[in-house]
């Protein structure tokens, strides 16, 4: 692979869980006009496709020609028992994997409880069925010796503002103040506690924990503070000029926010929280309701004013988040259409540096610029909860790869006692 310029994060991308080598002959034989071979997945990994029923089931079997890869060695004291059992074994450990595609959350959890699934990512809307308020397993799961693996996802949730929108966009002081006020008016702690059922926490900075560029000493995000939000609005002329109970723009025109949303019960909860919080500071908000793919099309065309999204990294590099604000990505990953010359220059410079203090300094400066202009309201870091039956061997939570199939095995001697 020959790069057009030094890009040290490329190695992390190539070694992430979503990257794999594909033989040139496969692309030549099965590739479509875009060079993809999605209908004929032939890779070079530890498993090969045995059976595929679209939208229902995937069966993988161990690749007999896979290169010799031993189980990785760990010096972590917490892994001693794991190392004693797995050290030196060749990957993949298990010969067959069945992936059952169950779209609805309730049937997924039921399948796990009945022992039809060996492990499960706990559906966010069913966390209360599995965990106690202190985030420990409920007694019936403990009785079945189910293990809980929990950690913060390498991701963020945020609400972006269209920087080209005549109401919320722009780089002047009063526009920055409006976006910052909207952020202070929104109660992320309530979102995390009520809507996300305690499975999230307020995000202090743009790059989440566990990812390069995260600085534990840096706090850039604003906290929920409706009183300060009101004062900031008053200071920059966002006041009620006609006595209708809603604030207006400094030039006297009505101030109305329009946020994208999807027609689901979960999205309605977010909409209600936004409506209630903004009403408390005198701002009117309306919702543009469309299916998610249609909202994405509108966003890429610059037709949405605001929209709430999430982003998750598959590698240890923080550029997956910074790239969402990089000017040349406007209309693609950069849905806010944020363009700031200093940010873009620092982004280009930092990409040419290896991970270290010099690059970390540039990434922190980019974060400071981001919070200075507030093209997003940064919301939360989310938690991952994986529940695993005792007959599954080798499971260790890796938030960058929550399905580590080659490293897992099944202990056939352990009695299968599902959740009652």
Where are these regions (language model features)?
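Active-site-proximal polar cores
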Residues: 379
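Extracytoplasmic/periplasmic solute-binding protein
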Residues: 204
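Membrane-interface helix-loop-helix junctions at transmembrane boundaries of multi-pass membrane enzymes
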Residues: 19-20
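Extracytoplasmic/periplasmic ligand-capture domains
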Residues: 2, 6-14, 26, 35-38, ...
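Catalytic beta-strand/loop signature of glycosyltransferases that borders the donor
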Residues: 382
């Amino acid at each position: 692979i020959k790069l057009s310029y030094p890009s040290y994060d490329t190695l992390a991308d190539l070694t992430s869980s979503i990257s794999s080598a594909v033989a040139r002959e496969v692309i030549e034989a099965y590739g479509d006009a875009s060079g993809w071979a999605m209908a004929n997945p032939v890779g070079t990994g530890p498993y090969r496709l045995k059976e595929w029923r679209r939208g229902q089931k995937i069966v993988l079997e161990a690749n007999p020609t896979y290169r010799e890869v031993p189980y990785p060695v760990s010096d972590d004291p917490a892994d001693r028992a794991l190392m004693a059992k797995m050290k030196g074994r060749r990957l993949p450990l298990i010969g067959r994997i069945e992936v059952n595609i169950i779209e609805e959350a309730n049937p997924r959890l039921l399948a796990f409880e009945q022992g039809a699934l060996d492990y499960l990512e706990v559906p966010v809307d069913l966390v209360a069925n599995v965990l106690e308020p202190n985030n420990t397993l409920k007694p019936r799961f403990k009785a079945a010796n189910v293990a809980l693996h929990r950690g913060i996802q390498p991701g963020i949730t945020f609400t972006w503002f269209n920087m080209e929108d005549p109401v919320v966009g722009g780089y002047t002081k009063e526009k920055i103040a409006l976006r910052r006020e909207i952020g202070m008016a929104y109660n992320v702690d309530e979102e995390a506690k009520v809507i996300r059922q305690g499975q999230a926490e307020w995000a202090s900075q743009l790059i989440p924990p566990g990812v390069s560029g995260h600085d534990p000493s840096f706090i850039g995000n604003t906290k929920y503070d409706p009183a300060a939000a009101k004062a900031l609005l008053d200071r920059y002329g966002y006041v009620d000029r006609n006595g209708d109970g809603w604030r207006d723009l400094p030039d006297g025109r009505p101030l109305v926010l329009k946020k994208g949303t999807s027609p689901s019960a979960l999205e309605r909860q977010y909409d209600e929280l936004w409506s209630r919080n903004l009403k408390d500071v005198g701002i009117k908000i309306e919702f543009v309701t469309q299916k998610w793919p249609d909202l994405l099309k509108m966003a890429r065309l610059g037709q949405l004013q605001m929209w709430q999204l999430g982003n998750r990294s598959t590698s240890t590099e923080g550029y997956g988040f910074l790239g969402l604000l990089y000017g040349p990505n406007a209309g693609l990953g950069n849905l806010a259409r944020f363009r700031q010359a200093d940010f873009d220059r620092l982004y280009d410079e930092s990409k040419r540096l290896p991970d270290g203090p010099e690059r970390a300094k540039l990434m922190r400066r980019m974060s400071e610029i981001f919070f200075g202009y507030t093209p997003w309201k940064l919301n939360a870091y989310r938690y991952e909860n994986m529940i695993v039956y005792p007959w599954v061997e080798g499971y260790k939570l890796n938030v960058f790869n929550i399905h580590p199939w080659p490293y897992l095995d099944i202990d056939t001697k352990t009695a299968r006692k599902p959740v009652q």
